[in-house]
Each structure stands twice: as C-alpha cells, then as structure tokens.
UniProtKB/Swiss-Prot annotation:
SMART domains: AAA. GO terms for biological process: CTP salvage; UMP salvage. This is Uridine kinase. It comes from Leuconostoc citreum (strain KM20). It is found in: Cytoplasm. The keyword S-adenosyl-L-methionine does not apply. The gene is udk. Pathway: Pyrimidine metabolism; CTP biosynthesis via salvage pathway; CTP from cytidine: step 1/3; Pyrimidine metabolism; UMP biosynthesis via salvage pathway; UMP from uridine: step 1/1.
Length: 210
C-alpha cells in the first residue's frame, strides 16, 4: 500500500465553475506526473427507478436528502485505502440512476466536487483541502441555463422554474453557509487562472510532504 492520497474538495453553487476548476487541477497535476481523478457528488443522486416519471421530475436535487451520501462516503474511503470502486452514473433525462457503473481506480490525488460537498461532516473530515468557488448568482444561473439545455435535455421554462423553486433557495439555505468550512475561497470559478495556479502549487507542495 502506498502513501495516503491527497483529497481536495471543491464546492460552490450550481454553475459556479467548480467542475471547471476541478478538471483543470486534474489536468495540471496529471501533466506534472501525478495520478489524479475526479469524483463528483452528482454521480451519487439516489436511484429513483421505483418512482413514476411524474414524481421523479419533482426531485429537489439541491437538498441533502437527494444524495446517497453513505455510498459516497464509503466509496471515498475505499479510494483512500487504494481500492478501486464502481461509481454510479446518473441519467439526468430520466431522473434516475443508470444501470451501468463506471470503474474508478485509486490515484495520488482525489478531487471531489459537488454543491453540497461540505454539508456532511464525514466528507469534510476526509478532505485535505476545502475550496469554495464563489460566483455571482446571475452568472451561475446563466451557466446553469446553458448547461441544462445543452447537456441534460431541459427546456428554458423548466430550468427557470426549477431555479426559482429549489436551486436559489437551497443555495442560500444549504450551500452558502458551508463557505465557513473552506480553507480557500476562489472568486469567479474557472476563469480565475491566478487562483488555479495557486491551488496547483499548493497541491504539489502537499504531495511532496506525503
């Protein structure tokens, strides 16, 4: 068994740019010779195959209860023990978990991201770095609108209704308060190259300390 992997947690509101930051860190650390993977909390939305579509479409994806957090924590702990996992895949158009899974191998660096990543103390306790990506509400909404239409088969009206009904209020109730747990706050998400440079250098320094 090798050294303990470095675990970096990145959170922020939907459309904040946290996944852009996460993927850029994976790319840079991989280019530098470290193995790095991205594990997304979104993959662990609960299976809803036992519910009719009329109920699935009402799911509040921005509430802590929408995630199978026990499985997420279990898989993260397994990766920390240098064990491979079978990561769930979420089928957004059908609002449930896909039948397929994705094999994920352990790595030197595990980057985890998600809107409610810091909400559970079991997850926070496993993170060596905790990063909050802080982006203006209007920018986050416009990014989410574009993403959900292009990638998830949503309608403009559906995205707007969901944002006003759950996304915005849940952000202020559950996401923004977890900013206090962050070691580092990154404004402007993936466009903040200075911050990404700093995060990359900090991760490299922590790897050397291992």
């Amino acid at each position: 068994m090798g050294l303990k992997p470095l675990v970096i947690g990145i959170t922020g509101g939907s459309g904040s740019g946290k996944t852009t930051v996460s993927r850029e860190l994976v790319r840079r650390l991989t280019e530098d010779g470290s193995s790095a993977i991205l594990l997304q909390q979104d993959s662990y939305y609960k299976d809803q195959s036992d519910k009719p579509m009329s109920e699935r479409v009402k799911t509040n994806y921005d509430h802590p209860d929408s995630f199978e957090t026990d499985l997420f924590v279990s898989d993260l702990r397994r990766l920390l023990r240098h064990e491979a996992i079978s990561k769930p895949i979420y089928d957004y158009p059908n609002h449930t978990r896909a039948k397929e899974v994705e094999p994920v191998e352990p790595a030197d660096v595990i980057i985890v991201d998600g809107v409610l990543l810091f909400n559970d103390s079991r997850v926070r306790d496993l993170l060596d770095m905790k990063i909050f990506v802080d982006t203006d509400d209007d920018i986050r909404f416009l990014r989410r609108l574009e993403r959900d239409i292009d990638e998830r088969g949503r309608t403009v009206r559906g995205v707007i209704d969901q944002y006003l009904a759950t996304v915005k209020p849940m952000y202020h109730q559950f996401v923004e308060p977890t900013k206090r747990y962050a070691n580092i706050i990154v404004p402007e998400g993936g466009e903040n190259l200075v911050a990404i440079d700093m995060l990359t250098n900090q991760a490299k320094a922590m790897l050397k300390q291992n």
